[in-house]
Amino acid sequence: MENFKGLQKSLYIWTDSADLDKRVEQLKSATGGDVALENVHRLSFSSYANSSFDLIVIECAQLTDSYVKLLHMLKPSGKLHLVSFIGPAASLLQEIKLSGFINCREDSPDALTAEKPGYETGSSARLSFAKKNASAINVWKISGDDEELIDEEELLDEEDKQKPDPAGLRVCSTTGKRKACKNCSCGLAEELETEKQSQKATENAKSSCGNCYLGDAFRCSTCPYLGMPAFKPGEKVQLGDNLLKSDI
């Protein structure tokens, strides 16, 4: 009882009325404060306000359903003291811990002490580690003005925009490929041969003046590119079919 000195308001829960006055006087002498009385069988019908007592002393520990209520009745950091309890101390300490008490200990073979946490039941506190670093937030902040959008049209070259020549997509009806079969009768063999001759003539065509790519205004009268639009130097140009045939 010496550990309870200075506690101003206590509650003594009794089971046996014999020598009750003597036990109450001992508690008053140890704490130096006021002591209220309550019968253990009437505790469930009591209506004590929360945080009413600094100390609660119980003569019997058969209060499995009332430990939480006692926790509410105690002030923050208030103490619960059990004497003359029945059953194993370890089992009783476990029940008290599960009810929310801390610092549960066995003072003697027939006495236990526990404490209510230093805050009111149901209270909340701000956690320091939950604060966010402002600089870290700004790093990941995305603004619509900062977005660099890519123009889809810039991803395509002029060559990509040109539609393919349907004639160049023709395939052999037998092989299913743009390659004539051995006994081609659909005309694909002649078409491929014409393209081959045209390509060969284009590769052999050379400019003596070096101005053929500029257009008809700069070309000779016998220029193979006469009548064709201007083109870039080194650009591959296909000559017309009329230039691939002999004049004689």
From Swiss-Prot:
Record's keyword terms, sorted: 2Fe-2S, 4Fe-4S, Cytoplasm, Iron, Iron-sulfur, Metal-binding, Mitochondrion
Similarity comment: family membership: Belongs to the anamorsin family.
Any GO CC annotation of this UniProt entry: mitochondrial intermembrane space
Chain intervals for the UniProt region annotation (N-terminal SAM-like domain): 4-129
Any one GO molecular function term: metal ion binding
Binding site for [4Fe-4S] cluster: 209, 212, 220, 223
Quaternary assembly: Monomer.
InterPro entries, A to Z: Anamorsin, Anamorsin_N_metazoan, CIAPIN1, SAM-dependent_MTases_sf
Region (Fe-S binding site A) location: 172-186
GO biological process: iron-sulfur cluster assembly
Region span, Linker: 130-161
Cleaved signal peptide residues: none
Notes on the domains: The C-terminal domain binds 2 Fe-S clusters but is otherwise mostly in an intrinsically disordered conformation. The N-terminal domain has structural similarity with S-adenosyl-L-methionine-dependent methyltransferases, but does not bind S-adenosyl-L-methionine. It is required for correct assembly of the 2 Fe-S clusters.
Motif window: Cx2C motif 1: 209-212
Protein name, as recorded: Anamorsin homolog
Binding site for [2Fe-2S] cluster: 172, 181, 184, 186
Cofactor: [2Fe-2S] cluster; [4Fe-4S] cluster
Annotated region (Fe-S binding site B), positions in chain: 209-223
Major location category of this protein: cytoplasm
Pfam families: Anamorsin_N, CIAPIN1
Membrane spanning residue stretches: none
Record's function text: Component of the cytosolic iron-sulfur (Fe-S) protein assembly (CIA) machinery. Required for the maturation of extramitochondrial Fe-S proteins. Part of an electron transfer chain functioning in an early step of cytosolic Fe-S biogenesis, facilitating the de novo assembly of a [4Fe-4S] cluster on the cytosolic Fe-S scaffold complex. Electrons are transferred from NADPH via a FAD- and FMN-containing diflavin oxidoreductase.
Span of the annotated motif Cx2C motif 2: 220-223
Subcellular location: Cytoplasm; Mitochondrion intermembrane space
